[in-house]
């Protein structure tokens, strides 16, 4: 059973998936920082200098705090600004993954086209067939009697 597990792990698809998950996790942090630290401040400046991550609607009359963190401590809130930030984060990540998959598919198609265009070399015939072919050719060149 251990050997079967080793064979399963050693297959390319499982290793590719593991690498993809690790890189995706790291890349997700990069995209989150891009959205939180670069894009959302620009969007906030365009719309009057507001920080979208602090936009919320109180769902209880007991909530009267000015920031999202304090409002959450007081009660239930509808944090639509935080959702907008996460949504933009997701859209950027999905777009980048789409472009990466599109690039990989393009490269894969190029390789397939090259393989189709290259003529396949036939393996040499067996030795007995080669010998019979040579005998036939010699007999064909021999003058008729």
Swiss-Prot record:
InterPro entries named in the record: Mechanosensitive_channel_CS, MS_channel, MSC/AndL, MscL_channel
GO molecular function: mechanosensitive monoatomic ion channel activity
Membrane topology summary: Multi-pass membrane protein
Keywords: Cell inner membrane, Cell membrane, Ion channel, Ion transport, Membrane, Transmembrane, Transmembrane helix, Transport
An annotated GO cellular component: plasma membrane
Localization of this protein: Cell inner membrane
Top-level taxon of the source organism: Bacteria
Membrane-spanning parts: 14-34, 38-58, 81-101
Function: Channel that opens in response to stretch forces in the membrane lipid bilayer. May participate in the regulation of osmotic pressure changes within the cell.
Family: Belongs to the MscL family.
Subunit structure: Homopentamer.
Protein name, per record: Large-conductance mechanosensitive channel
Organism: Rhizobium etli (strain CIAT 652)
Gene field: mscL
